Amino acid sequence: MGRRPARCYRQIKNKPYPKSRFCRGVPDPKIRIYDVGMKRKGVDEFPFCVHLVSWEKENVSSEALEAARIACNKYMTKSAGKDAFHLRVRVHPFHVLRINKMLSCAGADRLQTGMRGAFGKPQGVCARVAIGQVLLSVRCKDGNSNHAQEALRRAKFKFPGRQKIIVSRKWGFTKFSRTDYLKYKSENRIVPDGVNAKLLGNHGPLAARQPGRAFLSSS
């Protein structure tokens, strides 16, 4: 018996049903890798960022997430190069899908009980996605911005419903806009933290600081 189509589980109708000690025997998700490409590149290397944003409230299967990741990674590797981008899958499939298997052979009505006790067994997992939630994000150099948008356009065909490709105003995966990031960097108030960055704050009263030492040092 083949896998039931994901269109049967697309609508969010019930509560979250995660894997737990009450819900056992859940098959592993098809997607196992959520960061692809140069994930160790510093925050200054890739300033451009583009998102694939869901425009519907729906369930997205782990198979669809894996197919979209492969499509996006394949195009970016071919067009921009394998060390020219960082792709991140932003949703995780934690919701368990159930199936109440029905026999369709001759004499099946004597072997099964129909809809009596129809809770079902775990069949797969999916991610519960809201409107405006980011599905995939790609950061790269400004020269590869068109390649990143085309890669997300191709990944969009792997998902049900509607999605939009939105170019971020932020610097990479950080929460700072481009102008703010460059301004803080010129003032030595930004400390790189992997793919992100930390902003140094002002600790203590300014009156207790020495002249010219209003901000903490980056060391």
UniProtKB/Swiss-Prot annotation:
Organism superkingdom: Eukaryota
Any one GO cellular component localisation term in the record: ribosome
Impact after mutating residue 80 to T: In clone TM002
UniProt cross-references to PROSITE patterns, sorted A to Z: RIBOSOMAL_L10E
CDD domains referenced in this protein's UniProt entry, alphabetically: Ribosomal_L16_L10e (cd01433)
Gene Ontology terms describing biological process: translation
GO molecular function, one term: structural constituent of ribosome
Keyword check for Cell inner membrane: no
Keywords: Ribonucleoprotein, Ribosomal protein
PANTHER family named in the record: 60S RIBOSOMAL PROTEIN L10
Family in the record: Belongs to the universal ribosomal protein uL16 family.
Subunit structure: Component of the small ribosomal subunit. Mature ribosomes consist of a small (40S) and a large (60S) subunit. The 40S subunit contains about 33 different proteins and 1 molecule of RNA (18S). The 60S subunit contains about 49 different proteins and 3 molecules of RNA (25S, 5.8S and 5S).
Protein name: Large ribosomal subunit protein uL16
Name of the gene: RPL10
